[in-house]
Amino acid sequence: MQTIYTKITDIKGNLITVEAEGARLGELAEIERVDGRSSYASVLRFDAKKVTLQVFGGTSGLSTGDRVIFLGRAMEVTYGESLIGRRLSGIGKPIDGEGECFGDPIAISTPTFNPVCRIVPRDMVRTNIPMIDMFNCLVKSQKIPIFSSSGENHNALLMRIAAQTDADIVIIGGMGLTFVDYSFFVEESKRLGFSDKCVMFIHKAVDAPVECVLIPDMALACAEKFAVDHNKNVLVLLTDMTAFADALKEIAITMDQIPANRGYPGSLYSDLALRYEKAVDIAKGGSITLISVTTMPGDDITHPVPDNTGFITEGQFYLKNNRIDPFGSLSRLKQLVIGKVTREDHGDLANSLIRLYADSRKAAERMAMGFKLSNWDKKLLAFAELFETRLMSLEVNIPLEEALDIGWKILAQSFHSEEVGIKEQLINKYWPKSCLHR
């Protein structure tokens, strides 16, 4: 039997305090208003009989005489095959105008996957973006952020990854989205043709902060069910984790918690890690690969959100000047697949290209300072132009094998074979014989 409480003692922002007994942390409650409307709330903390709840949708119109009913369960989301192709809000309600989703309710606050059932990652997730596939491979079950500078079009990059990946299902969690961003996600998913394998959980900038906090949990709970029950390889795309952290900060300030670095709660690291650690490759099952966008306010890599994220994840993609910067990017799992599930020349070729591109940057600096350029400097600058156009551009959409072939052609068009520092047996096998040296 559910107990009804009618003594709301405090209303502050999106929080209410009610005198109640037996409430549990994270428990869901229904609020029945005197005007007949109802809304949901989640227990954030309790002190003796004083229970603090975060109200979904805000407290506007709420009165101290409204009825609060604790439901005895945590927040749930509907899971089933009918979820594919749908768009849902931060509380799991459809927002695409296509009716209710049918399926089984599942809890969203579940522990990370049993480590005993995890296996060492061994497969590559293809994106057809050379700066990822060739230089910083995305590995199945990897958790990796995109550190985005101000003004970068990270949403377009996410949409390209979603459209070009070989994952079975793509789940997108959008947090703090403007209406323009939300419309872009919907239109691009249809234009690029992956809406039939995509699920979107969307929190808009005008929605309550608590709904923003729930988005990653809903996306990852559904991803885990697809991976475990249906052996699907799921790619989860979350944007923007800085908005997620800001929502945590807003809730913590409203609750009068003592702030830590730059006003963020002291639990920020744990809150981020709890979500990222859901990435998993399951023995005799599917997998969850997680890519998130973390915007850097003021391009500050030491900001608490990217700083904490870097300690949790397995590398990062650094988006700068509308390119994935090869010097700021790193995949800590790429050695598990390079040369093992990819071509034998992959590692040596990628290392040579990046080394020569780094040298070309130094040559560009010498040219900018008015130094006389050597013939080697001129070769490097010509190489850099080809490299940036044919491999670094985010508009390039080619499979890994073609990217490797293009890499060899760029080297052959710019240098003699003995100048690139690659093993002779690979040179003999892959160096284009038809290319003329310049």
Swiss-Prot record:
Q: Which CDD domains match?
A: ATP-synt_V_A-type_beta_N, V_A-ATPase_B
Tell me which InterPro entries the record gives.
ATP-synt_VA_C, ATPase_F1/V1/A1_a/bsu_N, ATPase_F1/V1/A1_a/bsu_nucl-bd, P-loop_NTPase, V-ATPase_su_B/beta
**Which Gene Ontology BP terms does the record give?**
proton motive force-driven plasma membrane ATP synthesis
Q: Write the record's keywords in alphabetical order, separated by commas.
A: ATP synthesis, Hydrogen ion transport, Ion transport, Transport
Listed GO MF terms: ATP binding; proton-transporting ATP synthase activity, rotational mechanism
Q: Which family does it belong to?
A: Belongs to the ATPase alpha/beta chains family.
Its function, per the record, reads: Produces ATP from ADP in the presence of a proton gradient across the membrane. The V-type beta chain is a regulatory subunit.
Protein name as catalogued: V-type ATP synthase beta chain
Q: What's the encoding gene here? A: atpB
